[in-house]
Swiss-Prot record:
It holds the Pfam family Oxidored_q4. Gene3D superfamilies: NADH:ubiquinone/plastoquinone oxidoreductase, chain 3. PANTHER family: NADH-UBIQUINONE OXIDOREDUCTASE CHAIN 3. It is an enzyme of class 7 (translocase). It comes from Gossypium hirsutum. One of its GO terms (biological process) is photosynthesis, light reaction. It is a multi-pass membrane protein. Its main location: plastid. This is NAD(P)H-quinone oxidoreductase subunit 3, chloroplastic. Its EC number is 7.1.1.-. The chain crosses the membrane at residues 9-29, 64-84, 88-108. NDH is composed of at least 16 different subunits, 5 of which are encoded in the nucleus.
Amino acid sequence: MFLLYEYDIFWAFLIISSAIPILAFLISGVLAPIRKGPEKLSSYESGIEPMGDAWLQFRIRYYMFALVFVVFDVETVFLYPWAMSFDVLGVPVFIEAFIFVLILIVGSVYAWRKGALEWS
């Protein structure tokens, strides 16, 4: 039998954890001073007036390196718990982890062939 009163603590937690950020934004919106002027529209660089053009364009290589780093960082996050419990999980989980590593190797070879790992 499905009883809703067993989930009262969950619903209370959900409502409270949703209400706190909403209240924080509402209170800060009401209490914050609203001042408009030229100082509000200017760029802020460590308290000094910006010299030259404040808009900088980054090369796409930075984003490619960041993307490859995130992929391998996530790989480490997923493989570490598996390595710590390898003796308990057995062969089927080893096969799944092997397939996961193969997919990541295919992805890294693809990134390498596309030139995402070259800095020039």
